[in-house]
């Protein structure tokens, strides 16, 4: 039986996708170093090595949800215009647009969440835990657990991939990096929803 902790460690060490890590560990009978070799042989451990390389080519793409209710504009960068023009890269960018439209992330990664937002969220979560009657000595642990949930809901890279909840968007990104052999960066996005921020008034 392969533990979730082993899969997580292998993923952190290689940058490969979660399912690829699990398969490699099963193939290696749980041997971490052997699993790393398996991933390297398959070219799936390359993502981490490419992360430091400059990515200034790429695409700006748009997605409009049927009915014109939601629109997304996203910029995704890669290293060369050759890769930017491949169907694989274009499909990846389109998938990211659709993910943003469906899952409504606020940030790309947890590092992008402003400290003030985190502090406010912690205050609210702490008050909730205390109001639920949780003991003071476990409140901090509960709050940190809920902050992790906040990251998974609001940070694009940590969200479950809409087409395969077994993967995160980060897994999808790393798999695409491994396939295309270049660093890929989701640079920025904006999401519009019709009527968002407009106060509606009802006539009695």
UniProtKB/Swiss-Prot annotation:
Subcellular location: Cytoplasm
Chain spans, region Involved in Mg(2+) ion dislocation from EF-Tu: 80-83
Residues in coiled coil: none
Keyword DNA repair among record annotations: no
UniProt-listed PROSITE patterns: EF_TS_1, EF_TS_2
Gene Ontology MF terms: translation elongation factor activity
Matching Pfam families: EF_TS
Keyword Transport: no
A GO cellular-component term linked to this record: cytoplasm
Keywords: Cytoplasm, Elongation factor, Protein biosynthesis
PANTHER family reported for this sequence: ELONGATION FACTOR TS, ELONGATION FACTOR TS, MITOCHONDRIAL
Free-text function comment from the UniProt entry: Associates with the EF-Tu.GDP complex and induces the exchange of GDP to GTP. It remains bound to the aminoacyl-tRNA.EF-Tu.GTP complex up to the GTP hydrolysis stage on the ribosome.
Family indicated by similarity: Belongs to the EF-Ts family.
Protein known as: Elongation factor Ts
Gene behind the chain: tsf
């Amino acid at each position: 039986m392969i533990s979730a902790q082993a899969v997580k460690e292998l993923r952190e060490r290689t940058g490969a996708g979660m399912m690829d890590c699990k398969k490699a560990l099963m193939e290696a009978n749980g041997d971490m170093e052997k699993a790393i070799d398996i991933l390297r042989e398959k070219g799936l451990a390359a993502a981490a090595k490419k992360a430091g390389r400059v990515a200034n080519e790429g695409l700006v793409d748009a997605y409009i949800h049927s009915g014109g209710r939601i629109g997304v504009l996203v910029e995704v960068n890669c290293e060369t215009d050759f890769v930017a023009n491949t169907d694989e890269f274009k499909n990846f960018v389109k998938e990211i647009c659709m993910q943003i439209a469906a899952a409504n992330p606020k940030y790309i990664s947890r590092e992008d969440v402003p400290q003030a937002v985190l502090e406010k969220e912690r205050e609210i979560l702490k008050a909730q835990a205390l109001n639920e009657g949780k003991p003071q000595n476990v409140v901090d642990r509960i709050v940190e657990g809920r902050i992790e949930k906040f990251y998974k809901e609001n940070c694009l890279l940590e969200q479950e991939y809409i087409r395969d909840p077994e993967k995160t968007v980060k897994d999808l990104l790393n798999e695409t990096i491994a396939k295309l052999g270049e660093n890929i960066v989701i640079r920025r996005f904006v999401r519009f929803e019709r009527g968002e921020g407009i106060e509606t008034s009802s006539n009695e």
